[in-house]
């Protein structure tokens, strides 16, 4: 497992190792824009990332604090970004978990919960609640934190960002994830905002290739050009 990660090889869990995701197994604390008391618990999570309150308001429907007992009956709480399927009905199929903290105060950084459909699920968000299939602009990120930070930096100069759709892959993009989004958003402009490092460059190249494949497969030959 460690060697695979060092060599940037995908780590694939066998189906029997992937635990089913049940949102009812979690105690959820949500951000209410009309109740300052509900907002206070999020302060430390977002303060450390430089995410201001107005940005939290813009994305408040799409994050929460998720608390769950692990196998040793130890409570841990994470900032959770719900994952949904691009072609689904909005049902939450997993979490992109960030900054997990156990009850003893120890922390455990995670990209995604070790359960649920994280191979197909994505964090798919629009501040203006634009449906994915109606998006004119789609912005791709490796984490939900990155997406929120980008919005915060650019929304004053680009009011159209409110209508855009932000997608977080929660790490390495998986072909099934990207293909389902692209098939729904062929007319949209795809903005690739992955990290500016070797992994990010590789992710960008893979997504560009998938964009080309998706667009090419959608082109229908005219009768004059068909063999």
List each model region and its residues.
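Phosphate-handling DNA/RNA-contact segment within nucleic-acid enzymes
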Residues: 73-183
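Basic, glycine-enriched DNA-binding surface that flanks or lies within the catalytic cores of DNA
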Residues: 14-117
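Alpha-helix N-cap recognition
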Residues: 1, 143, 226-227
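TOPRIM fold recognition
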Residues: 152-227
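Short, small/acidic-rich helices and loops at N termini and domain boundaries
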Residues: 1-4, 63-64
């Amino acid at each position: 497992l460690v060697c695979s990660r060092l060599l940037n090889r995908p780590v694939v869990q066998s189906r029997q190792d992937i635990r089913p995701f049940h949102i009812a197994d979690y105690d959820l604390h949500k951000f209410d824009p009309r109740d300052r008391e509900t907002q206070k618990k999020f302060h430390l999570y977002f303060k450390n990332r430089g995410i201001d309150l107005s940005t939290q308001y813009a994305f408040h429907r799409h994050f929460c604090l998720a608390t769950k007992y692990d196998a040793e009956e130890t409570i841990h709480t994470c900032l959770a970004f719900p994952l949904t399927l691009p072609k689904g009905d909005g049902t939450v199929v997993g979490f992109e978990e960030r900054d997990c903290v156990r009850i003893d105060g120890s922390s455990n950084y995670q990209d995604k919960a070790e359960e649920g459909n994280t191979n197909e699920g994505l964090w798919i968000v629009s501040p203006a609640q634009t449906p994915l299939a109606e998006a004119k602009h789609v912005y791709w990120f490796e984490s939900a934190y990155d997406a929120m930070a980008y919005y915060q930096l650019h929304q004053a100069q680009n009011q159209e960002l409110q209508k855009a759709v932000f997608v977080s892959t929660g790490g390495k993009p998986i072909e099934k994830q990207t293909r389902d989004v692209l098939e729904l958003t062929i007319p949209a402009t795809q903005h690739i905002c992955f990290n500016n490092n070797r992994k990010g460059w590789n992710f960008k190249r893979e997504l560009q290739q998938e964009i080309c494949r998706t667009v090419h497969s959608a082109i229908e030959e005219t009768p004059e050009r068909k063999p």
